[in-house]
Amino acid sequence: NKEAPKYDGRCRNLSEEEVEQKIKNGESYVIRQKIPQSCCVEVHDELRGKIVFKSNDLDDHVLIKSNGIPTYQFANIVDDHLMEISHVTRGDEWLSSFPKNALLYKSFGWQMPKYVHLPLILNKSGGKLSKRQGDVFVEDYRAKGYLPEAIVNFCALLGWHPKNDQEILSMDE
């Protein structure tokens, strides 16, 4: 079984009275996003276009932890809305949370920013590039003699290429 761990839903359908009783009894709790079941969540990524997720594959993920602190993902959505963020650029590893984000925006009645998920830049051993493991800043590569145009060209072609398979682009392109 290669499925990711998923919330079992044991408290998903508690009545208001049952919830109030558990709180009155001092039981710890979290607040989760209740994902609609048996439907598709359609999102648009600026790089990939339309992506469809089956809601049954999504987890009712935690929004507020048992200590009352919002999760990073929840706080991030609220912050992006309050800051009027129009575009979100992030790595592929966040693609699985994209439908949950879309559902949160919809739940709040907020306009969702445009999202683009880019492939990760990997290190020599195939792992995610990390500042803990060496060069990650543009200045590091410039110090090693890489031209600014080469760095821009490399980044411009991450996860995309022109229809003619051109590998070298001018700065104007």
What residues fall within each predicted segment?
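A conserved active-site cap/scaffold subdomain adjacent to cofactor or substrate pockets
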Residues: 133, 137-173
